[in-house]
Amino acid sequence: METFNEKVTRLFQKHEALITRKNEPIEEGNGIFTRYKYPVVTAAHTPVFWRYDLDEQTNPYLMERIGMNAALNSGAIKWNGKYLMVLRMEGADRKSFFAVAESPNGVDNFRFWDYPVTMSEDVVPATNIYDMRLTAHEDGWIYGIFCAERHDDNAPVGDLSSATATAGIARTKDLKTWERLPDLKTKSQQRNVVLHPEFIDGKYALYTRPQDGFIDAGSGGGIGWALVDDMTHAEVKEEKIIDYRYYHTIKEVKNGEGPHPIKTSKGWLHLAHGVRACAAGLRYVLYMYMTALDDPTKLIATPGGYFMAPEGEERVGDVSNVLFTNGWIADEDGKVFIYYASSDTRMHVATSTVDKLVDYCMNTPVDGLSSSASVETLKKLIDKNLKKITNY
């Protein structure tokens, strides 16, 4: 019979095999990005000593004491030569928290730091915090902006589902010690708030997503833009929409900025999520757009349709048919690591380059917003290619 210590050893060996498994690029693709064979982080990647009491006296059956349900929606940053994700971890109790995992190469061997992030409370404590966007700002701080969820105390008696969403703010110098700042003050509920990495006219710039309720965007027109004077007491006084929602598109129900944009010689590269309604519920996909270098509110490229959508096992999970991103890393050589969650369950990576993503944005046709317009766009490409084919 296997001893307690032997069982513990087997747990650690199995975990180490998962952590060190080499990830493999999936070569067949569309030329824009490369997916990888395995998820980069799952609930099973969390340390054994997070989930099991390793004391035989208090856990003689070696049972899991603290269950982990999912690893999802991660901010990302290059830090001291390592690729770091600040993950949204969800426990079996449904509570989310933040934890850092680091990799030497960005595609595999992600290891969690020993302890999760300790995040202090705002004046009004939040029940749940999640989906952190990281920005290394030119002021010298690394900011994390995340959703802070609380029960809606104005809900009818017995309604234990209604909630409110605000943008929580914290900052750090080392990703270990976090200074909690007051939540962002806004006229509406907010999710998907992202800090622009540079000052604009001497002010901090935020990408926002105003919404009427906890889930529904309602009258919120899309991805917004606001300038604030001080992140230690941030307040949105004026807000304008820079990327609108449109009927019968991949972002008709709602959309939201993903990670902070990447600065390129041609403009700011943006990655966002779009949501549409279908018979199976809400479908989340990723899309891109670009804004002008001298005016980040000015759209200069809006490729039509989605950039990435769920495929294969990505389609299945706690909330199926969903891709979501709030983290990417652009290396100095131009390689881009896109970290995305599938179906609120696991984290993946896809790689591309700045040049490819700019080309995709600049040269993909816009959405004509009707079937007839889409056909005309398709016919133009067919005509061009048929002329080329006759020369072969």
Model features per residue range: what roles?
Residues 312, 329-337:
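Well-ordered alpha/beta subsegment
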Residues 323-327:
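Extended, compositionally biased non-globular segments
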Residues 260:
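Active-site/ligand-binding surface loops and adjacent short beta/alpha elements
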Residues 1-73, 77-127, 136-194, 198-253, ...:
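Beta-rich carbohydrate-recognition and catalytic domains
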